[in-house]
From Swiss-Prot:
<keyword id="KW-0963">Cytoplasm</keyword>
<comment type="similarity">
    <text>Belongs to the AIR synthase family.</text>
</comment>
<dbReference type="InterPro" id="IPR010918">
    <property type="entry name" value="PurM-like_C_dom"/>
</dbReference>
<keyword id="KW-0067">ATP-binding</keyword>
<dbReference type="GO" id="GO:0046084">
    <property type="term" value="P:adenine biosynthetic process"/>
</dbReference>
<keyword id="KW-0547">Nucleotide-binding</keyword>
<dbReference type="InterPro" id="IPR036676">
    <property type="entry name" value="PurM-like_C_sf"/>
</dbReference>
<dbReference type="Pfam" id="PF02769">
    <property type="entry name" value="AIRS_C"/>
</dbReference>
<keyword id="KW-0658">Purine biosynthesis</keyword>
<dbReference type="GO" id="GO:0006189">
    <property type="term" value="P:'de novo' IMP biosynthetic process"/>
</dbReference>
<protein>
    <recommendedName>
        <fullName>Phosphoribosylformylglycinamidine cyclo-ligase</fullName>
        <ecNumber>6.3.3.1</ecNumber>
    </recommendedName>
</protein>
<dbReference type="GO" id="GO:0004637">
    <property type="term" value="F:phosphoribosylamine-glycine ligase activity"/>
</dbReference>
<dbReference type="InterPro" id="IPR036921">
    <property type="entry name" value="PurM-like_N_sf"/>
</dbReference>
<dbReference type="InterPro" id="IPR016188">
    <property type="entry name" value="PurM-like_N"/>
</dbReference>
<dbReference type="GO" id="GO:0004641">
    <property type="term" value="F:phosphoribosylformylglycinamidine cyclo-ligase activity"/>
</dbReference>
<dbReference type="GO" id="GO:0005524">
    <property type="term" value="F:ATP binding"/>
</dbReference>
<dbReference type="GO" id="GO:0005829">
    <property type="term" value="C:cytosol"/>
</dbReference>
Length: 368
């Protein structure tokens, strides 16, 4: 049916049902569903309260008290991000309870690399037709991510927009604000040749490169419910939807206890070559021993099944390392010990060297 005729038919049907005129619901927006979602998520939001933020959702804006949070002369740092086409996996698999963790992780990990403590988070959830149960599952993940990061979920926007999205589709965006006391921001200005590069393990693909992941799955002829070829105990969807690791609390602990971290890089889109140079002085480069990278099975499978070259893997995925720390050589063992005690798997990946050309220099080969 042509679009104009279809719209006319819908209008005629609506008018025949309601002789008194059209309603917002006739246009596809269900205010009652929105209210039902708010009631479902109120306890989830309440569970993320922290010093500085103890209000209820529903106001025109969220409040945060920096003094109550213990800051005296803070610099505020803001970040926003999304989850990319990892959402398509969640939508097609009907599994929505973890992408909210990804959303928070992508934002708060970008804050902590600047030495900031995440304080509060806001989300934007847009869909064509609101399903309160689906929305509640998504917000439950967001609340869990906030709990892991120690930040408060102080507000958000749920947008039901008929005609903008296909049935079942949705999009997410996150916004996080953190703070650090003046003079304690990262990177520091004392990075020198010989500083050690530590790598913190990832949980999997995290939230970057999923357009390539989905293409490889497509050409492999696999279904999301099939056992994952690289993890037979879980379905392919479950394995690929493993949430992005949130590094906030272990890193903040290491910063406070050692004062040995000079720089941090969140390994997202662009991998090592695009992200590590962003935190280094122009005169220095990172020399990485690729044989020290513990490549996770999912990346070996993606490389083999998709015929993806090692260099392309390194500039698309994290390949098993989700966060990089640059530390003074004499404090590397201490920093690594604190991170490991906090539950991180840490590898010594290389060191800082004088830069001659590229910002990242590889030694050895990636063991895919």
């Amino acid at each position: 049916m042509p679009i104009a005729r279809e719209r006319k038919a819908r209008l005629e049907n609506a008018m025949s049902r309601k002789k008194t005129g059209l309603s917002y619901a006739d246009a596809g927006v269900d205010i009652d569903a929105g209210n039902a979602l708010v009631e479902k998520i109120k306890p989830l939001v309440r569970a993320t309260r922290r010093p500085g933020a103890d209000g209820e959702i529903g106001g025109f804006g969220g409040l945060f008290d920096l003094k109550a949070a213990g800051f005296t002369d803070p610099i505020l740092i803001a970040a926003n991000d999304g989850v990319g086409t990892k959402l398509k996996v969640a939508i097609e698999a009907g599994k929505h309870d973890t992408v909210g963790i990804d959303l928070v992780a992508m934002c708060v990990n970008d804050l902590v690399v600047q030495g900031a403590e995440p304080l509060f988070f806001l989300d934007y959830f847009a869909t064509g037709k609101l399903d309160p149960d689906q929305g509640a599952a998504i917000v439950a993940g967001i609340a869990e991510g906030c709990r892991q990061a120690g930040c408060a979920l102080i507000g958000g926007e749920t947008a039901e927009m008929p005609g903008m999205y296909r049935d079942g589709d949705y999009d997410l965006a996150g916004f996080a604000v953190g703070a650090a006391e003046r003079g304690r921001l990262l990177p520091t200005n004392d990075i020198v040749e010989g500083d050690v590069i530590l790598g913190l393990a990832s949980t999997g693909v995290h939230s970057n490169g999923f357009s390539l992941v989905r293409r490889i799955v497509e050409v492999s002829g696999l279904d999301w419910n099939d056992p994952a070829p690289f993890d037979s105990d879980r379905s392919l969807a479950e394995a690929l939807l493993t949430p992005t690791r949130i590094y906030v609390k272990p890193i903040l602990s290491a910063i406070a206890r050692t004062h040995g971290i000079k720089a941090l890089a969140h390994i997202t889109g662009g991998g090592f070559p695009e992200n590590i140079p962003r935190v280094l002085p122009p005169a220095y480069a990172a020399e990485i021993d690729l044989e020290a990278v513990n490549v996770l099975p999912v990346f070996s499978w993606l490389a083999e099944r998709g015929g993806v070259a090692a260099q392309e893997m390194l500039r698309t995925f994290n390949c098993g390392i989700g966060m990089i720390a640059v530390v003074a050589a004499g404090q590397a063992a201490q920093v690594a010990a604190v991170l490991q005690k906090e539950g991180e798997h840490v590898e010594i990946l290389g060191s800082i060297v004088p830069r001659r050309d590229k910002g990242v220099i590889y030694q050895g080969a990636l063991e895919l």
